[in-house]
């Protein structure tokens, strides 16, 4: 049997390098946008909650 491992390596690499890279890039961008959107929402909610609590605290201190 005359098998040259170099040829099979080239075939395997050419098929599998393109397929996962394209799919992982698509998943990656979807994950990035999902993660960014959720982190932005958490940041806004956290910041707004903090400001609201701070305002309530300051108003309560002024009443005393």
UniProtKB/Swiss-Prot annotation:
First and last residue of the signal peptide: none
GO aspect biological process, one term: neuropeptide signaling pathway
Subcellular location: Secreted
Pro-sequence residue ranges: 1-6, 23-24
Residue ranges crossing the lipid bilayer per the database entry: none
Predominant subcellular localization, coarse grouping: secreted
Keywords: Cleavage on pair of basic residues, Neuropeptide, Secreted
Biological function: Myotropic peptides.
Family note: Belongs to the orcokinin family.
Entry protein name: Orcokinin peptides
Source organism per UniProt: Camponotus floridanus
